[in-house]
Amino acid sequence: MISQNIRKKSVKLVKSLLVAATLITTSSAPAFATPKVVILVAGYGGSGCPDGSASVTVSPDGQELTLLFDKFIAEGNNAKESRKSCNLSIPIKVPQGFQISFYDADYRGYVSPYTQARLRAEYFFAGRRGPVFQRVFHGETDYNVRDSLATVANVWAACGKSENMRINAAMSARGRGIATVDSFDLAHRGLKYHIKYRACK
């Protein structure tokens, strides 16, 4: 009788452990269902973003990158300062078996009266060509534009590697005033990049 009771208790214990293990596995599965592509940091340089002149912020989940510039200002009435550029290098941590591509980029800035400005941006990975976007603005205007890269080109990094996104942006100005990318009001202007990813084929 004692041995039968022990056997019954053992069976119940095993069943309980199996149920507990199933619950743990079920609750843990979503955490591994969607691997994340994570933005690590950003490096920058150029006449429009000399060292120490930009503020770089990465969101807590690593999905968004924001840059705020202090000196990305082209002067239309100064030939030496009429074009400013900024080259960005953004290391991205890519999960094994996935590729990364650009999704979109938002730009905000200002063009003063009697000024024509041209914003040009190229997006690529090292050793690859990517799409180029150009826009012309006539001052006075506060602009807020988006380069919707997903609708134009799929620029994918190599499978299973951490990659450096590269963005070469330039602002040119003609006329009496200035054209900026993120100037003065940091709460409303800046540059934000988003990303998308897919499984390797």
Residue ranges and their predicted role:
Residues C159-R176:
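Internal, hydrophobic beta-strand segments that form the core of beta-sheet-rich folds
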Residues M1-K12:
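N-terminal secretory signal peptides that target proteins for export/translocation
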Residues F133-E163:
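Short, surface-exposed tryptophan/glycine-enriched loops
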Residues Q99-S112:
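A short beta-strand element within beta-rich, extracytoplasmic domains
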Residues T115-R128:
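Short, surface-exposed beta-strand/strand-loop-strand elements in extracellular ectodomains
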Residues E75-R83, P91-I100:
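Short, solvent-exposed beta-strand/turn "edge" segments of beta-rich domains on protein surfaces
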Residues A173-K201:
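Proprotein-processing/basic-patch segments
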Residues F32-G76:
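N-terminal leader/pro-regions and domain N-caps
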